[in-house]
């Protein structure tokens, strides 16, 4: 049944992804491009960008050990990706530490954040997922090492990053803060933000907007994800207008 759930959300999100790719193509007119993929899950974003852009390098990070196995298997089965994609089984955050990670039964929802089990959004989502999934909403919790993106990227010596994509289920601001002054080398930041109160984040969307504005980024794209209180955003570095 979990396969049916994935197919359902893939179909629902497909039109959104087409609009996002169309928009990014208008902004990035030079190939090949460099992408940092934080929260790679099973390789969905890698597949999306590989199909639509000429890629120079994709550096991906996935904190979940279970999800990373799927990601590694996907890369190993696609030989064209091996030379341009580097995958890392580590969490990305504000600073180096070890924190609790919640592995969800619906794996794409796995998060470093605590879950508000009393929220109306959680109760509604759980009813839907119970139709497809068996067992607890949180499959397991484990300690995961995280590093700052600034420290991670030092070893690559990248002069520019065309796209920084962040999908970390409530940990997006932590990732951005850990980028430090390397943020000036990023052209586009593509991320999602949950407006529901199921994920217990330590920030709001306004805080993300203020943080990015401070570093000369402007919001250039926004789209609602169907059936969810979640929006996807793209911010552009004004220095790359």
Give names to the regions the model predicted.
Residues 1-241:
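Phosphate/nucleotide-binding beta-alpha loop and adjacent structural elements of enzyme active sites
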């Amino acid at each position: 049944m979990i396969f049916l759930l994935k197919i359902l959300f893939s179909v629902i999100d497909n039109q959104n992804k087409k609009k996002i790719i169309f928009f990014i193509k208008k902004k990035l007119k030079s190939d090949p491009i460099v992408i940092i993929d934080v929260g790679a899950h099973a390789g969905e974003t890698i597949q999306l960008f590989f199909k639509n852009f000429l890629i120079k390098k994709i550096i991906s990070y996935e904190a979940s050990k279970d999800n990373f196995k799927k990601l590694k298997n996907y890369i190993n089965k696609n030989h064209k990706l091996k030379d341009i994609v580097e995958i890392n089984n580590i969490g990305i955050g504000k600073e180096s530490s070890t924190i609790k990670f919640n592995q969800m039964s619906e794996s794409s929802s796995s998060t470093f954040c605590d879950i508000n089990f009393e929220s109306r959004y959680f109760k509604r989502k759980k009813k839907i997922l119970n139709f497809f999934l068996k067992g607890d909403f949180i499959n397991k919790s484990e300690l995961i090492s995280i590093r700052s993106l600034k420290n991670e990227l030092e070893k690559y010596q990248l002069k520019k990053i065309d796209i920084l994509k962040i999908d970390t289920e409530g940990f997006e601001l932590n990732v951005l803060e850990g980028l430090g002054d390397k943020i000036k080398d990023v052209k586009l930041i593509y991320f999602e933000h949950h407006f529901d109160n199921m994920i217990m984040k330590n920030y709001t969307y306004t805080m993300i907007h203020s943080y990015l504005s401070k570093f000369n980024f402007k919001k250039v794209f926004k789209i609602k994800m169907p059936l969810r209180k979640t929006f996807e955003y793209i911010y552009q570095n004004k220095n790359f207008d």
